[in-house]
A protein has these predicted regions:
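Short, flexible, basic/aromatic active-site loop/helix in glycosyltransferases
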Residues: 112-145
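The conserved acidic donor/metal-binding loop of glycosyltransferases
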Residues: 69-73
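Active-site donor/metal-binding and catalytic loop motifs
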Residues: 99, 194-211
């Protein structure tokens, strides 16, 4: 993060139940990082992304929050792009480049995190083009709630508090990002689908089990039918 052209004020690592070896890595990282690092942990009780995100939100005084996953590499202007595009009453969703399995292995071995042009094996490589001109043309406000990437989102903390954060009814993989998007829209917030800026590269890995999608779809459908604005189980 210290290599970002606009570094964040702090880094919060939201840890959903990792063991002590992860804490040792984070402690080592914290000592080498110039930016303050907070390690927020919760007990392993299955996939509880909404819960650990809420715990992280409670543990920061920053007024604008950028969410990323632990399996992505950030363009050096990633933070800058989110900050430059923030506006009152707006939240931002971005895209990602999906690196191939072989390319992911190569990068992990060589520790080469610089991406030059589009000469690397990946899906959605157009998402790796950073252009302020193209971004102005193709970035649009929209009301879509699906295909939202929680690994590339940003919000005002006050807006997250208004919708009571992420809904911890969602456990297992899926739909918590669609749910908070819908509740933000129900509270008259604007969603910016940011293109050709806020670039990130997703490392290949096997997908998580998706056996909770049907349950989570039912919760999302309740949010839709009830025009829900606040999380049922959220920040407070």
């Amino acid at each position: 993060m210290s290599e970002q052209s606009t570094p964040p004020n702090e880094i919060i690592i939201a840890d959903d139940g990792s063991d002590h070896s992860t804490k040792q890595i984070i402690d080592c990282f914290s000592k080498s990082e110039k930016i303050p690092v907070k390690h927020i942990w919760q007990e392993d009780q299955g996939f509880r992304l909404a819960g650990i995100r809420n715990k992280a939100i409670r543990n920061t005084d920053c007024d604008y929050l950028i969410f990323v996953d632990g399996d992505v590499i950030l363009h050096r202007d990633f933070v800058k792009d989110h900050i430059d595009e923030r506006k009152e009453g707006r939240f931002i969703t971005g895209s990602r480049v999906l690196l191939s399995e072989d390319e992911t292995k190569r990068r992990l071995v060589t520790e080469d995190w610089k991406f030059r042009g589009l000469n690397y094996p990946a899906k959605n490589k157009l998402n790796g083009i950073r252009s302020c001109f193209l971004s102005r043309v193709f970035s649009k406000n929209n009301s879509g709630i699906y295909n939202v990437r929680g690994c590339n989102m940003s919000f005002w903390k006050s807006d997250l508090q208004e919708v009571n954060g992420f809904d911890e009814q969602f456990t297992g993989w899926g739909r918590e990002d669609s749910d908070i998007t819908l509740r933000m829209l129900n509270c008259s917030k604007t969603k910016l689908k940011l293109k050709f800026k806020a670039i990130q590269y997703h490392l290949f890995h096997n997908e998580r089990e998706r056996d909770a999608v049907s349950k989570n779809d039912r919760i999302l459908n309740e949010t839709i039918s009830q025009n829900r604005k606040k999380a049922v189980i959220g920040l407070i």
